Amino acid sequence: MNEDITPKKPNAIIEWIDYRLPIFSFLKHFSHYQTPKNLSYLWNLGSIAGIALVIQIITGVILAMHYTPHVDHAFDSVERIMRNVNYGWLLRYTHAVGASMFFAAVYLHIARGLYYGSYKAPRELLWHIGIIIFLTMMATAFMGYVLPWGQMSYWGATVITNLFSAIPLIGESIVTWLWGGFSVDNPTLNRFFSLHYLLPFIIVALVMLHLVALHQHGSNNPKGIDVKSPKDTIPFHPYYTVKDFVGFGVYFIIFAYFIFYEPNYLGHPDNYVPANPLVTPAHIVPEWYFLPFYAILRAVPSKLGGVLLMFGSIFVLFLLPWLDTSKVRSANYRPIYRIAFWIFMTDCLLLGYLGGQPAEGPYITISRFAACYYFFHFLVALPLIGKYEKPLPLPEEL
């Protein structure tokens, strides 16, 4: 008996909607999207970061329903969430740990891009949008850290906003404008709460733009070579959706461990003390994901110099597609760059450690050397390596 292979007629309602709003065609494009066939699990990190963003938005919206953005009630409202709101402790810990997990995924995502040359032509704008997302994440996380209104929240806000006073002529006016007064107080807290609620949705818009740029030229791959024929690609679904779910499983196991066993491991105990403008903590430190930049900030005696270097350490990433002069993308075929990459990763970890230490003695001295190497890697090493390195022969196909 012959099987009827006549194609099914599309649902009339779906067809009517899709003709006017092509969401079903868009979903079909995603499932049939051709990707390089040799992507490793490191390419899961983008999807993991997307899941982390969704978790942050959902938990953040629910927490905002119970939070009171007032200096007299903010700390108490957070404690009320922990004690009186059904599963409030779970929501808060998921949101707090989720921020760290989000940054961990994004840092690994950036590191993968650095290793495999994902910033090189024709993906420069894809890289730039990614760095803008990273900057927006940093602003969102900083404002969120202020909201519990503990000691570290208050003094962290005071220290970081005071950095703008280093700007000649207009710095003091900018700080007063940011504070909404002459010190960190209720107007500051309200502004930070409002912006902390808004910025994640801006991140979502930027992520959509990031995906549009990604689909224009497709994903990079471990070999760093362009796709030359259809046999070099496979559909995203089901091959990479299944792979993504494996990554999600590992991610959620680590996530759950921190939520249920070490929820405060990545935080600071001083933030469980209500904010007191009259008592300065012995050691003011930001969250762990800001520590490398904090170490660079403190490495320079001049406030203006420290601020310029701190922001410069991020903005230098925008110049990366042109600073790296090599025509080869992947570090797998660049023996000298591969060594430089791992030295740079070690330097970043060292800066992270130094940022969490007191600003005294050998810590400051080592921070200066580490900060110098950070900029040396981008501004000196990369252009010279690209010019003089002899890369290994590239394969003809994936």
UniProtKB/Swiss-Prot annotation:
Quaternary assembly: The main subunits of complex b-c1 are: cytochrome b, cytochrome c1 and the Rieske protein.
Other noteworthy facts: Heme 1 (or BL or b562) is low-potential and absorbs at about 562 nm, and heme 2 (or BH or b566) is high-potential and absorbs at about 566 nm.
Binding residues for heme b b566: H109, H210
Localization annotation: Cell membrane
Entry's family note: Belongs to the cytochrome b family.
Record bears the keyword Membrane: yes
Descriptive protein name: Cytochrome b
Keyword Repeat: no
Membrane topology recorded in Swiss-Prot or TrEMBL: Multi-pass membrane protein
Keywords noted in UniProt: Cell membrane, Electron transport, Heme, Iron, Membrane, Metal-binding, Respiratory chain, Transmembrane, Transmembrane helix, Transport
Biological process according to GO: respiratory electron transport chain
Transmembrane portions of the chain: 45-65, 96-116, 129-149, 164-184, 192-212, 245-265, 304-324, 339-359, 366-386
Predominant localisation class: membrane
Cellular-component GO terms for this entry: plasma membrane; respiratory chain complex III
Residues where heme b b562 binds: H95, H196
SUPFAM superfamilies to which the protein is assigned, alphabetical: a domain/subunit of cytochrome bc1 complex (Ubiquinol-cytochrome c reductase), Transmembrane di-heme cytochromes
Cofactor(s) annotated in UniProt: heme b
Superkingdom in the source lineage: Bacteria
Free-text comment on the cofactor: Binds 2 heme b groups non-covalently.
InterPro entries: Cyt_b/b6_C, Cyt_b/b6_C_sf, Cyt_b/b6_N, Cytb/b6-like_sf, Cytochrome_b, Cytochrome_b_C_euk/bac, Cytochrome_b_N_euk/bac, Di-haem_cyt_TM
GO MF annotation list: metal ion binding; ubiquinol-cytochrome-c reductase activity
CDD domains: cytochrome_b_C, Cytochrome_b_N
Function: Component of the ubiquinol-cytochrome c reductase complex (complex III or cytochrome b-c1 complex), which is a respiratory chain that generates an electrochemical potential coupled to ATP synthesis.
